């Protein structure tokens, strides 16, 4: 079995954000994000070793295979979510929601203010992530929250905006005070990136909307 490996995307590392210091970004990007990349790759090596993760001993209570597959989801989603997070941040923000995105937000959530309030509420309520995404099956925009990278994920949700709510995302700047970090996050959104994600997500929905017959 081939070994799938990931490489960290250094070009996504943001700098000089408003309200989120470079000192905060440094361990977040270099230790946490790159740590998930490294552990995902290590897990792939072990899964490729048929002797290490003996499939014949797979067990729902405990087995090496089960543990590797569980941690594979945690580390892989840790990589993807962090890349989506870092990739949409730019100093002081940029642009605004496109007319198409604003119309969709109005239809599905009740407007940009309502969407912002929902995202902020999810960011306070969930321990890992708050997400605005497009449900690939219904075509609706949905605000979702995760307690960990791999806990409460909605199958088929394409993330457009992701807020990291783990304490490692804000502890250097704000200690245990999450609200000012959330406010700072919204000041640095690159709407050009979000708009592009939305356009691609809608194309994916159009291609897959009859996926479930």
Curated annotation (Swiss-Prot):
One of its GO terms (molecular function) is metal ion binding. Its cofactor is Fe cation. Fe cation binds at residues 28, 82, 164, 168. It is an enzyme of class 1 (oxidoreductase). InterPro entries: Fe/Mn_Superoxide_Dismutase (IPR050265), Mn/Fe_SOD (IPR001189), Mn/Fe_SOD_C (IPR019832), Mn/Fe_SOD_N (IPR019831), Mn/Fe_SOD_N_sf (IPR036324), SOD_C_sf (IPR036314). Keywords: Iron, Metal-binding, Oxidoreductase. It catalyses: 2 superoxide + 2 H(+) = H2O2 + O2. Binds 1 Fe cation per subunit. Highly thermostable. Retains about 70% of its activity after heating for 60 minutes at 100 degrees Celsius. It comes from the Bacteria. Gene3D superfamilies: Fe,Mn superoxide dismutase (SOD) domain, Iron/manganese superoxide dismutase, C-terminal domain. Belongs to the iron/manganese superoxide dismutase family. Destroys superoxide anion radicals which are normally produced within the cells and which are toxic to biological systems. This is Superoxide dismutase [Fe]. It comes from Aquifex pyrophilus. The gene is sodB.
């Amino acid at each position: 079995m081939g070994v799938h490996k990931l490489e960290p995307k250094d070009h996504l590392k943001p700098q000089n954000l408003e309200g989120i210091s470079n000192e905060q970004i440094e361990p977040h990007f270099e230790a946490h994000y790159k740590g998930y990349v490294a552990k995902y790759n290590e897990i792939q090596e072990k899964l490729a070793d048929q002797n290490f993760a003996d499939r014949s001993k797979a067990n729902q209570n405990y087995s090496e295979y089960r543990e590797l597959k569980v941690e594979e989801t945690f580390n892989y989603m840790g990589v993807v979510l962090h890349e989506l997070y870092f990739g949409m941040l730019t100093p002081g923000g940029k642009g605004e929601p496109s007319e198409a995105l604003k119309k969709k937000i109005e239809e599905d959530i009740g407007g940009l203010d309502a969407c912002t309030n929902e995202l902020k509420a999810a960011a306070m309520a969930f321990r890992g992530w708050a997400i605005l995404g497009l449900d690939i099956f219904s075509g609706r925009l949905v605000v979702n929250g995760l307690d960990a990278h791999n806990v409460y994920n909605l199958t088929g949700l394409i993330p457009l905006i992701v807020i990291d709510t783990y304490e490692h995302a804000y502890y250097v700047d704000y200690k245990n005070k999450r609200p000012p970090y959330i406010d700072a996050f919204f000041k640095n959104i690159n709407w050009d990136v979000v708009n592009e994600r939305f356009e691609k997500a809608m194309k994916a929905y159009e291609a897959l909307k009859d996926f479930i017959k």
